[in-house]
């Protein structure tokens, strides 16, 4: 029980009767599928060149630990059979780490469900820098809008 006095309840009841019922609005199905943001997050670890684990703070006093895949890019895979791709994956991971080092928090924008359970897809900013754009500019990521991913030939 929040309090012993009926006065607050009576006040809000009389306000409702005087002003009439408030209009209730509900989110549409598409609104439930994404969060415009920004959502403040602290980076826990860099997983690879396009995925990070963060503690996101969608509401005051609450944190959600989640993997975030950067929207619009793809980087080489760490678990590739090709040694050249594994080396490129490490370079991409190092670049992502460099881009976010020194920022105590980042912002997640346009957060939506990812392709795989437990991962969300989002745009990310560290300061004023868009991280996906910076990864593309580095040459260590390629544009990716979903669907079949590019698989380079293995030279060795």
Stretch-by-stretch model annotation:
Residues 2-156:
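Small beta-barrel nucleic-acid-binding modules, primarily SNase/OB-fold domains
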């Amino acid at each position: 029980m929040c309090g012993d006095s009926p006065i607050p309840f009576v006040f809000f009841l009389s306000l409702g009767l005087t002003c009439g019922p408030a209009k209730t609005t509900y989110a549409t199905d598409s609104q439930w599928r994404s969060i415009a943001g920004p959502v403040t997050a602290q980076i826990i670890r860099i997983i690879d060149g396009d995925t990070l684990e963060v503690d996101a703070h969608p509401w005051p006093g609450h944190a959600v630990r989640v993997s975030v895949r950067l929207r619009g890019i793809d980087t080489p895979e760490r678990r590739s059979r090709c040694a050249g791709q594994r080396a490129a994956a490490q370079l991409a991971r190092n670049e992502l780490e460099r881009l976010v080092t020194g920022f105590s928090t980042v912002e997640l924008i346009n957060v939506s469900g990812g392709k795989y359970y437990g991962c969300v897809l989002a745009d990310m900013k560290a300061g004023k820098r868009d991280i996906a754009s910076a990864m593309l500019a580095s040459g260590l990521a390629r544009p990716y809008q979903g669907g079949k991913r590019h698989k380079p030939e293995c030279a060795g």
